[in-house]
């Protein structure tokens, strides 16, 4: 085994499995903790990072991030489970978890300059999960930026020399609201733009957008 800096290596270069530098943390909600991540190179285009964390107050957490990069697609999935976490509401030990995932796909349609499709998932089973474990979670590109708002759905983008079309669907979950009011659904939505005619002094375009 060997120690290396805590970063996700370029998937195009040869990687080696091994322990990453340990991480020490202290938070008001969880107290002191230590993490000893392990990087596992599955193959040339796939790898995982196991990140077990032990807290002084007996709470235990394991976070696993999986990454795969193919010729026309990339997948990142981050799963974390915390055991024996004591909630302030009931003072009982419970388990908490999160799931973050993002899939980017280049559809490679003929006749199009760009043709991309993306899926994304953000889920937690406890409303204050992100606020409590934010400083403990390994930093990555798919962790929600807003600790009170989750977003799951998909989007796409098509572009050729004549027009462009984008659209998708979103499910927003506001963790600060009660169960009946927290969800906002935006699907489908679209944005269409077409070049109708070009002139010496400019262009004539048609644009349309909308959502349900």
Language model features with spans:
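Outer-membrane beta-barrel proteins and related beta-barrel translocases across Gram-negative bacteria
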Residues: 1-212
